[in-house]
Amino acid sequence: MVFMRVLLGIFMSGIYPGLALVISSWYRREEMQFRFAFLQSGELIVLATGGIVNFGLNQIDDHSRLKGWQYMYLVQGLVASLVGILTYWWMVDFPENAQRSFHFLNEEETNIAVARIEDDRNDVLPTELSLSEVLRQFRDVKVYGFSFMFFLQNLVSTALSYFLPIILQSGMGFSQNKSIILAAIPYYYAVLPVLISSRVGDRYGIRGPVIVFNCFCLIAGFGMLGFAEQVTARYVGVFLATGAYVSNWAALNGYQASNITGQWKRAVTAASVTACNGLGGVAGSFIVKQNEAPRYHTATAISIGSHILIIAIVALFSCFFFAANRRQKRGKSLLEGKDFRYTY
């Protein structure tokens, strides 16, 4: 079983960097965050619905030769396999090769798509791939800053998504069945803040303020979850925290994609942030300690502290981006391109 879990992780590892790279390749910088929000919303709906479906499948435990958890693997594995097969034809190519995709764009429409991206950042066609070209991308400090923010972000997301039923059951006194159902509701709710905040970010061309606002919402949510006395107030805190970290997933993706140009730098950044996102997930699985119920002080403190750090990094990046844009405007330096400006 451990070996199968390792295989599952290996095959899943390329999904998010691949999707992030494709989205950032197809859309202009002022359009990206809202598209990342749609991607995240789809995951949320599947995650929440999957929890409810798993709850139902687990009830079969006493009425069949197979265990409930075995039905979970069979049903979800079958659905994932079918979708994966369909995706081979459904997934589109990069803009310059879009006419090759299955019934997607004709040659004229492909040229329009390419022209949009060239006008925005002039990086449709990649340079020749080489090891030195890949390693050169790691000289950019932004890659490390964005990666570290994703690490800090996923400390919270893993703790909440995997341990929310435990928090509801042990920390708030709900039954096991009620905890499973109640754990799904915040994820359905989170679709609203991620879409709204992302639309605002794209509409007004801002990234940092949206991230900081979401961080404050998460800090308030975890404060309620960790220190409020009433169960209702603590559950409201779960909603605030879940909506905030989900919104920041799209916001951080929009932030890095808006300030990175070049196909290989995008690919390297997407891979780096995904790797650090995974490391954050590993670390996040240790911060919810059962013996700290019902307050979970370690998880509360680390979650709040991690988002204070995100605010600090965003502030530093914003100052750097502002100064760099100002230097380019005065003709004192050249950024990623002649007409490129950082988005903050």
Regions found by a protein language model. Give the residues of each.
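Paired small-residue
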Residues: V2-L7, T232-L240
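Cytoplasmic helix-loop-helix junction between adjacent transmembrane helices
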Residues: M4-S41
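Intracellular juxtamembrane helix-capping segments at the cytosolic ends
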Residues: G14-Y27, S247-G262
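Glycine-rich segments within core transmembrane alpha-helices of 12-TM secondary carriers
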Residues: Q33-R65, L74-A80, A270-G284
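Interfacial helix-cap and linker-helix signal at transmembrane-aqueous boundaries
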Residues: V53-S64, L168-Q169, V200-D202, I287-R295
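Intracellular terminal tails of multi-pass secondary transporters
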Residues: Y88-D123, R266, S272, R295-Y344
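Extracytoplasmic gate region of multi-pass secondary transporters
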Residues: S132-R199, W249, N253, S285
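Structural signature of the two symmetry-related core transmembrane helices
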Residues: P209-G223
